[in-house]
Design a protein with these regions (language model features):
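Short glycine/proline-enriched turns and hinge-like loops at secondary-structure junctions
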Residues: 13-17, 61, 217-218
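Tryptophan-centric aromatic hotspots in well-structured domains and transmembrane helices
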Residues: 1-3, 20, 47-48, 67-69, ...
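C-terminal helix-coil-helix/basic helical segment that borders enzyme active sites and/or dimer interfaces
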Residues: 105-108, 119-186
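A short core secondary-structure module
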Residues: 1-33
């Protein structure tokens, strides 16, 4: 099952005349093509619709008011993720790899700053979760969480590249599974090059570039905050 924002009325403003529709992926005319990422991994797909017919019962909300539904869901997509704990765990992993690689105090200081930022983000997320449990909505906090979480995640992939150095260069897809985890390569494959910790570094760096684009680019999130909070 997927959802789709479909144009049902073109007479008003662009955000009007949109309907939120659920579509069964087994419906005749639905085609799914893989999107190969710059890392060589298959993580996302492109969906095409060829004369697809969907029953009216699949409309969520009211016809022509789908943008309202979409905005509500986007708040939770942007602000419902718990970036903090995952990013703190990644910092811990990078600390261990950095120690093994013998990096200097500058890298350790940058990792400490990243850990502090992840802890601050986690605290903000916990505050928002408390508000959500009381029946609130993410609101503008969702935009802030999305910006902070994705940009800190990207910063950690950059630090990982620096720590790995030249060991991050070899492309070794046969040593990873679709989830990006390091696995034993099939019989006859080339031997692992470099430390295991460096195998997925480049792929994660490349894939994480999308973080500041999906769910509304970070530039758009800053515009939302500037308009609502600063009146710009």
């Amino acid at each position: 099952m997927c959802f789709c924002l479909v144009r049902t009325d073109a007479s008003g403003k662009p955000q009007q005349g949109i309907t939120f529709l659920l579509i069964d992926m087994t419906t005749p005319g639905v085609r799914v093509d893989p999107i190969i990422m710059t890392s060589g991994e298959h993580i996302q797909n492109a969906i095409f619709f060829d004369d697809v017919r969907v029953p009216k019962a699949n409309v969520i909300g009211k016809v022509n008011e789908g943008w309202t539904v979409a905005k509500y869901l986007l708040e939770f997509e942007r602000g419902g993720s718990s970036y903090g704990p995952r990013l703190k765990a990644r910092v811990g992993s990078l600390r261990r790899v950095a120690a093994e690689a013998g990096t200097g105090p500058d890298m350790l200081a940058r990792l400490s700053q990243a850990e502090a930022d992840a802890s601050a983000l986690e605290a903000a997320e916990l505050m928002m979760m408390s508000e959500l449990s009381g029946g609130g909505t993410p609101g503008l906090k969702a935009s802030m969480m999305k910006i902070k979480g994705t940009e800190l995640s990207q910063r950690l992939t950059e630090l990982a590249l620096e720590i790995a150095g030249n060991w991050a260069r070899p492309f070794q897809p046969h040593h990873t599974n679709p989830g990006g985890e390091v696995v034993n390569a099939p019989s006859g494959s080339a031997a692992l090059v470099g430390p295991e910790s460096a195998v997925t570094v480049s792929a994660k760096y490349l894939n994480d570039r999308a973080g500041s684009i999906y769910a509304g680019s970070n530039e758009i999130q800053r515009n939302i905050l500037a308009k609502a909070q600063l009146g710009l």
